[in-house]
Amino acid sequence: MINRRQRLEFALTLLPYDPETVQLSETQKKVEAIIARLRTDDSFTEEESDDCKVRRIQDANEFADSAMRHIEMSDSGKLSTLETLTLAAEKLLRTQRSPDQDFDDMVQDVEYSQLMRNTIQAVNEARLKLLQQWERSKRKALDLLTIEIEKVQEMDQEPEHKQSHEQDQDQEQSSEPFNAFRDGADEHNTSTPKTNDEDLGLDDDDEDYVPGGEETMGNKRKRIKKPVTSTPNAKRRCPGFEFDLDGESPMVTIGPNGTEVSRISLSAINWDMTGPSITRKLLCEIFDRDTLAHHTLSGKPSPAFRDCARPSKQQLDPLKVADLVYLMTNSLDMTPREVRTAITTKCADENKMLRSRMQRKSK
């Protein structure tokens, strides 16, 4: 094994340069100074044999062949740096290593390659987990987005339903002044008096009320009751009630909300009358006349009197109204709209008669 002095001296002898034409770098100058100092060292006094000399020359030739492939000339004519020479010397030393060292290096390389494979596999598994987690997050975000879109669609549909419902209510309320005007015109029309209580839209409660002083006014028409024939129509019996569990109770539950009506009053109603007339009868049994005069079906002011200074009315109990609608739609061939129209008309009539009574009292 050659020492540092021999390696540097041998590398310097192989340099293909002319000291007069080639300018050395600072690093190369330091190399020459080191070699000159080593040449003055007397520690290397061993004499070589002929065989050793031939072997050294042969090794030198092999080293020269390999070193020449690593020595490069720069554009300015300078030689390679000290690192190139050192690399060539290390390659020469590496060729002189023992088989045990080569085996250790091979084992190290195998272990290093195995470590790299394990590292790459671990990194790939971590990336796969991240991709799966990202996929789950993306699906969750898509589900949440779908839910939000459905909520927005429902919110967009709600104003349409609400608008249609308000239009229906406004239409019902707009019919109130017309019905009041129609009823008022019928009441004050004396040219063609009507003799049918059903055509007048009056019930027994309306007929029972006679304002004070009306008997003395001969110019007012009188209501003529229907003539009783010798063969009157058979009175239809009171229908059965779904929620009437106790037949001996004086009150009958007519709907799922627990609204009760007197059993005697239900038996006294002529169920052969039209649906609106029966609705008005039952409405007077559920609410008193003062309540009907000061309440409406929706509780909203009529659009016909929006700019007028009219007192606002309250809403009828929606549970009782729902029970009445339930009874009439299940017992008779009526639609919920027909029942609500009859309720609206009855409230308008009671309010009109209340105002008439108040005007007569003020006079």
Swiss-Prot record:
The BEN domain mediates DNA-binding. Signal peptide: none annotated. Residues 155-168 have a biased composition (Basic and acidic residues). PROSITE patterns: BEN. The heterotrimeric Elba complex consists of Elba1, Elba2 and Elba3. One of its GO terms (cellular component) is chromatin silencing complex. Keywords: DNA-binding, Nucleus, Repressor, Transcription, Transcription regulation. Pfam families: BEN. Residues 255-354 form the BEN domain. Residues 198-209 have a biased composition (Acidic residues). This is Early boundary activity protein 1. GO terms for biological process: embryonic development via the syncytial blastoderm; heterochromatin boundary formation; negative regulation of Notch signaling pathway; positive regulation of neuron differentiation.
